[in-house]
A protein has these predicted regions:
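Glycine-rich beta-strand-centered segment in the early N-terminal region that forms part
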Residues: 24-41, 51-95
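N-terminal Rossmann NAD(P)H-binding glycine-rich loop of SDR-like oxidoreductase domains
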Residues: 152, 160
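Nucleotide donor/acceptor-binding cores
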Residues: 4, 85, 143-145
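Adenosine-nucleotide cofactor-binding segment
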Residues: 148, 164-170
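Hydrophobic/small residue at the entry helix of a nucleotide-binding pocket
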Residues: 155
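NAD(P)H dinucleotide-binding glycine-rich loop of Rossmann-like/cofactor-binding domains
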Residues: 89-150
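C-terminal hydrophobic helical "lid"/dimerization subdomain
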Residues: 1-4, 168-188
Length: 188
């Protein structure tokens, strides 16, 4: 067991419900790693958990869905990561607003040297969402025209850039902001 600082809520509400507290986290079990956070992503999902729009199973609860950091320890049988590895994750449940957490290794992505921890923590959840939409929900191909309706947010911006890289034409409604990410068609 380790004691770490965390930000938790004891009930739903505004930002005044965020409390800085010390909590205990366990040791990693089979298929898990303990990650010491170096950067934490902030998302609308976190606000929705805090306000109660996305209910939490119980209180008090740590919120936060994405972070980056360094593996501190691994559970039995874990060979995919080892202590000292830099990783990022998009969590299966809120737990990122803390100094460290225990995470299933299936959620961890090793970070290459050219991606810093702050960038990884800020983009992984949005990037995985964009990846799902562009690769799984509808595989986008060169020459195809796609409409990105909400291109001003994190997911939309990543989708614009990714679609451009794939050679697809992008149509957007947010004229000025979309010019900066290479939109091919701008809708008034």
């Amino acid at each position: 067991m380790s004691r770490v600082n965390a930000v938790r809520i004891h009930r739903n509400g505004g930002p005044e419900e965020l409390r800085h507290e010390e909590i205990e986290i366990g040791d990693p079990g089979p298929g898990e790693a303990r990650v010491q956070h170096t950067a934490i992503g902030l998302n609308f999902t976190d606000i929705h958990h805090r306000t109660g729009r996305y209910p939490l199973p119980q209180f008090p609860h740590v919120i936060g869905m994405e972070a980056a950091g360094v593996v501190e320890a691994v559970g039995a049988g874990v060979s995919e990561v080892r202590p000292g590895d830099r990783v990022a994750y998009a969590s299966d449940r809120p737990r990122a607003y803390s100094q460290a957490t225990v995470m299933p290794i299936t959620r961890l992505v090793k970070l290459p040297d050219f991606i810093d921890d702050e960038t990884a923590a800020a983009v992984i959840l949005k990037g995985l969402t964009a990846q799902y939409l562009i690769r799984a929900a509808h595989p986008v191909s060169a020459g195809e025209t796609i409409l990105i309706q909400a291109a001003a947010g994190g997911v939309g911006l990543i989708m614009c850039q990714w679609a451009r890289h794939l050679g697809a034409r992008r149509a957007h409604r947010d004229l000025e902001a979309r010019r900066t990410v290479g939109s091919s068609i701008l809708l008034p």
